[in-house]
Each structure stands twice: as C-alpha cells, then as structure tokens.
C-alpha cells in the first residue's frame, strides 16, 4: 500500500488540465471512460499498477477517481458533466458556482469564493476519510485567472489548517511573458503567490508560452491548442506520480519531492522539463538513449517556464526516468550532465540529484501528436534562474500599480489596498531570497579569507 493522492482541480485551467491528466491515467491503468476495466486491455496491465493511489473501487467493480473539480463559472464543469468522462467522476466531486470570478482575485478569494469553500472542504474531507493513508494533495490551478488565483489560495489556506502534515503539491499555470489571457494577470499572480508561499509545500510552475513553443518546435503543430499543451503537461504529472502506482528500481513518493527539492521553505518553485517531446513522423530518426534524453531535459528550450537556467545555479534536481531504463545508464547520464560547463550546481549542495526509476512505459493518448516511446525523463529542477520569471511579473505589477489601474475592482470586492503592497513586498523578498541562495558560496570564500 503506497498511500493515496487526492487531485483538486480549480478554475478553468485546473479543470482542463485535470481532463487531460485523467485521460492519461485511465489509459495507463487500462480503464475505460466509465472507470471500468477495459476488456480489450486484458489482465496484463492490471498486474503492475496499483489502482488505490488515484481511484476508489466501488462494489460493482468501477473505479472512481479521487479528485475534485471546482470552478466558480459553471461552463467548464458542465463540459465534464456532458463530456466523454461523465460516467467516470462522482457527481458530488464536480462543484460549480453560479457566477464566475471575472478574472478577479478578490472575487475568488473573498466574495464569490467564500460561499463555495465550505462545500469544497467538506468534499475533500469525504475523499480523505475514504483513504487509508493519505499521502497528500495535488492542486491544479492558474495564477492568472480569478478562480485559480483567488479560490486556489483560499482553499490551500484551509487545507493547510486541516491537513498540515500532508504534502500539498501545486501545478500552477504561470502568466507568460508575451501570451496573456487577462489584463489583470500580474495582480492576480502576485496576490496568489503571496498567499500560497506559506501554504504549499512545492509548486511546479508551467507557463503557456514555453509549452506552446515546445509544441510548435518539437511536434510541428503550427497552432497548438490548449489540449496539446495540457496533454504534454499531463505526461509530466503522470511521471511524478508513476512511482506511487507502478513498480520500479527507485520509487519516489510525494514527501521525497519536498525533502529533495526544497532547500528552504520559501524556495519551493521547481522548473519542469520533459523529454522526448517528438512527433511520430520524426521519431524514427532520433536516438532515445537515456543520456540523450537527460541532456535534452537540461536544454532551456525544453523547459516549461520561459527562463534560462544557464544564468542561474541549480540547487537541487530530481530526474524521473520512466520505461526501459537501468540504474547504471542513469548514473552515467547524470555524470555527463554534471560535466557540462553550462550546468552549475550551488557549492553548498554537492550531490544535488534525486533519481526515480520506474518501469512503466509512458502511455500515449490515441490521436495525440506525441510519438510512442520506450522511455522518458522528467526533470524537476530547483534553480535560481526562476527569479527571472518573478522579476518579470513584479515589473508588470509595478507598472500597473503605480497608476493604481484596475485596483478599484479589487477594493470593491472587499479587499484592502494594503494587501497589494504587502503581496508585492513578499515577492520582492522572494526575489531577494533567490539572490542570496545563489550568492551564498561567494560570501563563504570572503569569510575564509579573513581567517
């Protein structure tokens, strides 16, 4: 028994990411769209996978996901209620409001969100009572929207009071440098980050622009849709949890991510990269050796946030291998990665690598552009380069806030203006934390010289 994981999908981004993630989980476990075992898949799949982690089995042999979908706007959840997976989810796990948060953090956090949050916490309690040893929560939401930022922050506050000791990992869609879906994104993101720094154990950032570029460049999709993006992100989410569900040489559970990736409590924003992202018509010309995939993950253009890790230092890296891999190959691949000049580890963390190896091959969604492959690597790296992303965001926030543009919408929903400056100061402190961590080694040398 490896412990269960509850998924919580918040807002439109979280809900659509959830759709892609569950689509993939069903394939990996050989289940049909109604949550029953697919007779065509046969018995072989069932042998290796543990269903309990993500699914509750009912008396009639149906598997129900341990997940909750919440949105203040009814339409994304209605899509699930009428979509191909309407038989899969428990109707009580799909919670929608009457009016949306209108891209406004304050509506999601104070006015509209307040009415729904008790219902949601109650549903979470029911899910967790159903678990024999709950490992933790995976929370999916965006930082730019109203529900994702406001309600997401509110729910995480409640979760950390009720489930303080359980891991809470977030997958957050972060505002991109050039692709924007809302004018007030910088406000929402700064406010949301401020309130989740304390309440989340580890937050994996994904930004749409970076994933767009990966889809365009590697999958030859001229105009990628959100579905393409979500399917790619789902592969990473699946690798992170694959050890909980399938057997492997080195298994990794949720607590190990925190232990190995988060050197200081506030610095918990790892980057994600995934390889191989390749289309079916190119795959015959490529080598998928463990070493090649590992080096691909370290390339800036395979990362899911627009920032250049060559400008920063790595504090900790988790490499999750999946499929046909043996530990020896992985060790060699890591050695060659460490030898690269562009790969800088901080001096106070000499080992720096956590490895997971899982024997389950990456599954491929029928009709997706990703080529079927025998092995894949996900790299989660906590690097100081991510502070580039924070400073970009802070700069946009400052431009708008200097004129107090759009602030009245937030104040009108019961927020105080002081909260803006408080949140902004907190993020300035976060940037400072990252600078100090990167510069620590230099101070040490100065001190030694004095003695």
UniProtKB/Swiss-Prot annotation:
Q: Where in the cell is it found?
A: Cytoplasm, Cytoskeleton
Reaction catalysis annotation: GTP + H2O = GDP + phosphate + H(+)
> What are the positions of the active site?
256
Q: Which Gene3D superfamilies match?
A: Helix hairpin bin (1.10.287.600), Tubulin/FtsZ, C-terminal domain (3.30.1330.20), Tubulin/FtsZ, GTPase domain (3.40.50.1440)
List the residues marked with site Involved in polymerization. Answer: 451
What is this enzyme's EC? 3.6.5.-
Q: What is this protein called?
A: Tubulin alpha-2 chain
Origin species, per record, is Emericella nidulans (strain FGSC A4 / ATCC 38163 / CBS 112.46 / NRRL 194 / M139)
What taxonomic ancestry is recorded?
Answer: Eukaryota, Fungi, Dikarya, Ascomycota, Pezizomycotina
The coding gene here is tubB
